[in-house]
Each structure stands twice: as structure tokens, then as C-alpha cells.
Amino acid sequence: MKFPVVFAILLAGGCLAPAQTNDLDLGDVFDAAQKWAQDNMDDDVLKTLQTVDRDQVVDFLNHFQNYLKGDFVVDLAQLHTAAQTVLPLLDAHPETQPYAAWLRARLDYFEAAETLQQLPPKPAPEKPLPPRQNPSFKIEQEIWIKKVAPRPWPKNAQEIVPELKRIFTSEQVPAQLVWLAEVESGFDARARSPAGAVGLFQLMPTTAKKFGLNLWPRDQRQQAEPAARAAAKYLRQLHAQFGDWRLAVAAYNSGAGTVQKLLQRYRTKSFARIAPHLPAETQLYVPKVEATIRHREGAELEQL
């Protein structure tokens, strides 16, 4: 398997912020990318990349992940073209189709970021510009409600959602939260993130093991029922910790430590207070989950 040189084009124009490209040292970038890969990517990804131009692919994934973990939602807009270009390349090879499934479930974030980027600017103030800010949570909610409204049920969802709901209910978690699987993976159990999250509910290895899943000889994260039970247990634990479903969903995406630190930093128990300070992906993830649950179930996340 060989990926075309399109990755070089993506790196030059699709993933790097303009301010970063002027004095870019490719040697430094590749060295940093290799170190990042060893620290952040699971063994299966590294094995897959052994037969491709690994420096370019890893550097692409490095910047991709960094933007998702970044501070500003609109920065994700510049990844849209790159993601659309690389998706069919990943889809074309069985070895990388799980990563295509993961990326496909996140194209929405880049589209939403483009929409937010195109909103009319506020009138220029007479005083110096204030610090850069993220769009309000309310604006993000409105965008996601419009985006998910026309969507049919994902493939396979009708077959497995009833059983997933039964499992969530048995774990004392609102059944409507099974729709996290649509946001996480598009109900594609093959989905795998570059960092090693796998399955319908994108569980990391440590989380999966903590909640009783086996990763070998068969990875139970790719089995709908065991994965749903582990995800439900994790969500129940997060809700017990934070007492709020928005905070619990944010923690599911970004980690409980991230949410806890922000709550402590801003001396609050409110999701609304910390929402603009969450990682960019999480800022888009929570309102997307809300809009998806509203569309599929007619329910409100904060009232579950």
C-alpha cells in the first residue's frame, strides 16, 4: 500500500496554520512527528504506517489531533479540505478503513467550524480588540440543530439501538445516551482513532479494561453489547462525579481530568461557564450530542 504525495500537499496547505508555514523546518517537523507517534499512537497504527510514507502521514495525523485538542473552534475549519481529501485514501485500503470510519464521524466538526467562521463579524470596537474568543454555546447549539435535522438513521442503527438502550437502562443510565455512538463512530464498530480509541463508543484501552472489556484475543470494544455496557458504566461514573449530563458528556470526550481542572480554575459547577474553555472538539461534541438526542428522541440532554 502506498499513499500518493497528496499528504505533502495537505501538510503544506491543509493542516498548518499560515503563520506557521513561513519558517517551517521540515526536519524538525518530522522529528517531532515521530516522537509524537511513539507517545500517542497505538501499535496497530504504527504497523499500518510502516508501508507508507510514514513521516508525512504521521505529521498529518499529528496536526489533525492537535487542532482537535486546540483552544479555538474556528481553527478546525482549515482542516475540512484536508479531511475530505484524505478520507477516500483511508477508505481505499482495508488496513486503514477503521481510521476512515473514525474520521468520517468527525467531518461535521470541520463543517460546523466553517459555518461559525462565516458568521458576520461584530462591529469593530474603538478600543483595542479583546482577547480572541470562541463562539457562544448557544450559537453552536443552533448550528447543530440545523445540521442534524435532515439526517436519517445511520446504517445498522435500527438493528442495534433497541438492545443498546436495554443495556443502558440496566446500567441505570438514560437510554437516550446510546446516540453517543452516532457522534463517536457513526455506528461503525470498526472505527479506530489514531490514538487507539476503538468501536461504537470509541473507548480507549485503559477505559475498556477498567470496565471489564477484553482486548485480546478479540477486541470487545468492536462488539456492540459489551462496548455499550462499558460505555454506560463509564457515563454513570462521570455523572456521579459531576452531577450534570453536559459535564459528563464533555468528560467522556475530553477526559474527566480536563473538566475537573476547568471547574476548579473557574470556581464553578456550571457547564456553561467552562464551555468556551474546553478543547475545540469537545466544544463541538457536546452540542452535537445534544442535537442528535433531540432529533432522535425528542429529549433534552440536560433534562435526562
Where does each model-flagged region fall?
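Substrate-binding/active-site groove segments that recognize
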Residues: 195-217, 228-235, 261, 286
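Solvent-exposed, acidic/flexible segments
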Residues: 150-161, 170-173, 193-201, 220-228, ...
